[in-house]
């Protein structure tokens, strides 16, 4: 039974529901920038704090544990920001999202994040043990094992998933135009580099966050420009 307001009341309710629909903030692309900066800071701290050779006992004894611990503490926050970045990309795709490539895009992003956390957890465990019995741990070879496992997971498997994420994202971009074509082709080239690098290039992990930084900066600029229009 309709109230005195009748159809007018129903229309007002419908309009109210439309107005309350959640929308992505225009500044949400900051999440990708935050991810890039946090991950690059973490990688730089680790690279400059640990000896290049895991068998170098003297180098391990001079490790600045506090710097490495800080680097590892940044990783979870980088991961949270990356999830927001994925959400921003999906929001820009909207109804044009291709189910096949979107599945690869989303799955590779989650696998990248899982392996990033895994490598950070292994490194964190080794560093924690180092704080309890440094000399015994270095001599036992546990440090070398932990370092090699962390290196393999981060530089081989994590980077492969980053490459797949880049390829699927750039393919979606070429189909939908969410960012310029030259950025997509650059992403393809960088993704191939990550897939073929086989962990042989020490600074290769920086490629992915730099690419995310480029894409996020473009999206943020486009969103803010649209907001001022």
Predicted regions and their residues:
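Exposed boundary/loop context
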Residues: 1-5, 22-25
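Hydrophobic, aromatic-enriched alpha-helical segments typical of multi-pass transmembrane helices
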Residues: 14-229
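Short, Lys/Arg-enriched N-terminal segments with co-localized hydrophobic residues
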Residues: 3-14
